[in-house]
Amino acid sequence: MSNIAPQVLRHASRACSRRLSLSASLVRPAYSARTVTGSGSGGRRYVSGSQRHNAQAQTTVESAVKTEQKASVPGTAVTGDALANPSAGILKQATIMDEGNRPIYLDMQATTPTDPRVLDAMLPFLTGLYGNPHSRTHAYGWETEKATEQARSHVATLIGADPKEIIFTSGATESNNMSIKGVARFFGRSGKKKHIITTQTEHKCVLDSCRHLQDEGFEVTYLPVQSNGLIKIEDLEAAIRPETALVSIMTVNNEIGVIQPMKEIGALCRSKKVFFHTDAAQAVGKIPVDVNEWNVDLMSISGHKLYGPKGIGACYVRRRPRVRIDPLITGGGQERGLRSGTLAPPLVVGFGEACRLAKEEMEYDSKRISALSQRLLTSLLALEHTTLNGDPNRHYPGCVNVSFAYVEGESLLMALKDIALSSGSACTSASLEPSYVLRALGNSDESAHSSIRFGIGRFTTESEIDYVIKAVKERVTFLRELSPLWELVQEGVDLNTIEWSQH
């Protein structure tokens, strides 16, 4: 970390404290009338009636603070405006912290950076607009309720749903648990619907939810996938039976990026009168999603996977035909009784704004990410013994999973310490076991261990991709030269014919 960063942070803290104390002393008429005015960020704030004559003094304070900040941090690329205004300064955050020493970020499947425009939308609800959105007897509650309902509408519009079908949760993990356990327990009480179908390549929270239900007496069928990561519709149709309550199949896989045939799956489930749930955390905001066209009954969405804040997500629950679920969290009956607890307006508003931006900019983002992905993939596959994991056609371009034969994935990650990458799901990254997703594709342990996932997103640049290509080629070549297996391969030896002795 840069040695100037502590100085910057201490000074910014002092400046902020000084500004707040001066504001408090300048504007403190007791019991003065309040009016609602517009704010520069598009939100609303309460101001006292006597604040008008203090406006000039407040402007002077702001100007003095910025001037002092500029003078106190010479040599940085951060302006006083950026330090005083968090929304302006977020794009310079890396400069403040490390002066350019942070790795290139290519782990977009783990999380995405918060879009600065999302932060702009959130800021008023972290300060002046602090009402409980469920308090309907005064203006503080009304204004936050209006904002949360607008956010709900943005989420619904993104997936072609009705706003009343959107239930806010803490994220996709909760939404997956809520959907799978909720439907299974509601319809399993009769004892007639105690069968669930999912795939072997689902996210860990889906697989764990199914295992918990198995402990409760439910039967679960784990469908295999083909070598390209896609299921066979024939296998799904054969697995459905009269006691099947739910089919849960993710839209875009978080490790290999394959896109399952959602229309065909949804049509089959609807014809068999079986509820269809999909974990769409890696799809919503990145590819076109329509719950009605796909005949989806339940869908899990995550805010931080589409440039929104962490800790917020949504569960789409269809109203017609109605889907009945047992809630996981009970209490005050918020969110139509399906998810009790007070909503966090800053997170909800940020999530809604992220969805609005995703809808508005999806076509542009998609074309740009596709071009960067093709540039990366073409160069990487030019290396010997390098393969793309997953179907090359039914594939989200922002997720590129490549196996580099005769190179240990963990060694390559360490060699690429200037690039933030992953060898698989962030939820299983602490495990040294080979990826269960790649194993389900039929990959060997060696192939699974040699895989690296490249995540490309909205803020990835062409120069970053070019740097990554150069670095990967150099370091893969270097690591292979250290491997005795690579030497044998170069000599034309078939490693499968070697009988290895054990000591």
From Swiss-Prot:
<keyword id="KW-0496">Mitochondrion</keyword>
<comment type="function">
    <text>Catalyzes the removal of elemental sulfur from cysteine to produce alanine. It supplies the inorganic sulfur for iron-sulfur (Fe-S) clusters. Plays a role in both tRNA-processing and mitochondrial metabolism. Involved in the 2-thio-modification of both 5-carboxymethylaminomethyl-2-thiouridine in mitochondrial tRNAs and 5-methoxycarbonylmethyl-2-thiouridine (mcm5s2U) in cytoplasmic tRNAs.</text>
</comment>
<feature type="binding site">
    <location>
        <position position="254"/>
    </location>
    <ligand>
        <name>pyridoxal 5'-phosphate</name>
    </ligand>
</feature>
<feature type="binding site">
    <location>
        <begin position="302"/>
        <end position="304"/>
    </location>
    <ligand>
        <name>pyridoxal 5'-phosphate</name>
    </ligand>
</feature>
<feature type="binding site">
    <location>
        <begin position="172"/>
        <end position="173"/>
    </location>
    <ligand>
        <name>pyridoxal 5'-phosphate</name>
    </ligand>
</feature>
<dbReference type="GO" id="GO:0005634">
    <property type="term" value="C:nucleus"/>
</dbReference>
<feature type="compositionally biased region" description="Low complexity">
    <location>
        <begin position="34"/>
        <end position="50"/>
    </location>
</feature>
<feature type="region of interest" description="Disordered">
    <location>
        <begin position="34"/>
        <end position="58"/>
    </location>
</feature>
<feature type="transit peptide" description="Mitochondrion">
    <location>
        <begin position="1"/>
        <end position="27"/>
    </location>
</feature>
<keyword id="KW-0809">Transit peptide</keyword>
<dbReference type="InterPro" id="IPR015424">
    <property type="entry name" value="PyrdxlP-dep_Trfase"/>
</dbReference>
<dbReference type="GO" id="GO:1990221">
    <property type="term" value="C:L-cysteine desulfurase complex"/>
</dbReference>
<dbReference type="InterPro" id="IPR015422">
    <property type="entry name" value="PyrdxlP-dep_Trfase_small"/>
</dbReference>
<dbReference type="GO" id="GO:0030170">
    <property type="term" value="F:pyridoxal phosphate binding"/>
</dbReference>
<comment type="similarity">
    <text>Belongs to the class-V pyridoxal-phosphate-dependent aminotransferase family. NifS/IscS subfamily.</text>
</comment>
<keyword id="KW-0408">Iron</keyword>
<dbReference type="GO" id="GO:0005739">
    <property type="term" value="C:mitochondrion"/>
</dbReference>
<dbReference type="InterPro" id="IPR015421">
    <property type="entry name" value="PyrdxlP-dep_Trfase_major"/>
</dbReference>
<feature type="binding site">
    <location>
        <position position="282"/>
    </location>
    <ligand>
        <name>pyridoxal 5'-phosphate</name>
    </ligand>
</feature>
<feature type="modified residue" description="N6-(pyridoxal phosphate)lysine">
    <location>
        <position position="305"/>
    </location>
</feature>
<dbReference type="InterPro" id="IPR000192">
    <property type="entry name" value="Aminotrans_V_dom"/>
</dbReference>
<dbReference type="GO" id="GO:0051536">
    <property type="term" value="F:iron-sulfur cluster binding"/>
</dbReference>
<feature type="binding site" description="via persulfide group">
    <location>
        <position position="427"/>
    </location>
    <ligand>
        <name>[2Fe-2S] cluster</name>
    </ligand>
</feature>
<dbReference type="GO" id="GO:0044571">
    <property type="term" value="P:[2Fe-2S] cluster assembly"/>
</dbReference>
<dbReference type="InterPro" id="IPR020578">
    <property type="entry name" value="Aminotrans_V_PyrdxlP_BS"/>
</dbReference>
<keyword id="KW-0479">Metal-binding</keyword>
<dbReference type="GO" id="GO:0031071">
    <property type="term" value="F:cysteine desulfurase activity"/>
</dbReference>
<keyword id="KW-0663">Pyridoxal phosphate</keyword>
<dbReference type="GO" id="GO:0046872">
    <property type="term" value="F:metal ion binding"/>
</dbReference>
<protein>
    <recommendedName>
        <fullName>Cysteine desulfurase, mitochondrial</fullName>
        <ecNumber>2.8.1.7</ecNumber>
    </recommendedName>
</protein>
<dbReference type="GO" id="GO:0008033">
    <property type="term" value="P:tRNA processing"/>
</dbReference>
<dbReference type="InterPro" id="IPR010240">
    <property type="entry name" value="Cys_deSase_IscS"/>
</dbReference>
<keyword id="KW-0819">tRNA processing</keyword>
<keyword id="KW-0808">Transferase</keyword>
<feature type="active site" description="Cysteine persulfide intermediate">
    <location>
        <position position="427"/>
    </location>
</feature>
<feature type="binding site">
    <location>
        <position position="342"/>
    </location>
    <ligand>
        <name>pyridoxal 5'-phosphate</name>
    </ligand>
</feature>
<dbReference type="Pfam" id="PF00266">
    <property type="entry name" value="Aminotran_5"/>
</dbReference>
<keyword id="KW-0411">Iron-sulfur</keyword>
